[in-house]
Amino acid sequence: MKGLIIIGSAQVGSHTNALSKYLKGQLGEHDVEVEIFDLAEKPIHQLDFAGTTQAVDEIKNNVKSLQSKAMEADFLILGTPNYHGSFSGILKNALDHLNMDHFKMKPVGLICNSGGIVSSEPLSHLRVIVRSLLGIAVPTQIATHDSDYAKLEDGTLYLEDNEFQLRAKLFVDQIVSFVTNSPYEHLK
C-alpha cells in the first residue's frame, strides 16, 4: 500500500510538515509506504517563501513528480496551514496540476494547522474539492493549533498533544481500512 502526503505550506519545517511526519510514522506501523511531497521544498508555484522565483525546469520537474506520485498512490493526504480561514494558494496550485484520474475513488485524508484561531474551515473547503475530483474524503480529519506541538533541541517540531495523537490513530486506521476494504475498486 502506497500513500502520498501533499503539504501545502510555504514554510520549510512547518507545523503541517510536523503533523505529516507524525502520520507517516503511524502509517508505517501498518507497513504502509508513504512519501511526503512538501511544496515548500519542491515548489510548483512561481514564488517561494523568500520571494525568489524558481527555475522553470525545476517547476516542471516538480509537477511531473507530483503527478506521478499521485497516480501511484493508493490514498492521498492533503495538508495545509489555515490561511485566512481557507487552505493555501500553494496547495490550490498543486491541486490544479492534478485531475480526477489522480483521485478517482481513492481515500483522501485532510489535515491542517492554525497559528491563530483553530478552525476546520480549510478542511471543509478541501472536502468539496476532493469530492469534485471523485476522491473519497475520510470522515476523520485533523485540525491542530501551534500549541499542540513542542520543539526538540534542534528546533524540529513534533506533535505533543495526546488527544491529537489518538485522533491521528483513528485517522490512520480509517485510511488503511478504506484502502484495504475498498468497495469502490471496480469503479476506478
From Swiss-Prot:
Coiled coil regions in record: none
EC annotation from Swiss-Prot or TrEMBL: 1.7.-.-
Top EC class for this record: oxidoreductase
Required co-factors: FMN
Keywords: Flavoprotein, FMN, NADP, Oxidoreductase
Superkingdom of this protein's organism: Bacteria
GO MF annotations in UniProt: FMN binding; oxidoreductase activity
Gene3D superfamilies cross-referenced by the UniProt entry: 3.40.50.360
Annotated GO CC locations: cytosol
Purpose of the protein: Catalyzes the reductive cleavage of azo bond in aromatic azo compounds to the corresponding amines. Requires NADPH, but not NADH, as an electron donor for its activity.
Protein name listed in UniProt: FMN-dependent NADPH-azoreductase
Gene this protein is translated from: azo1
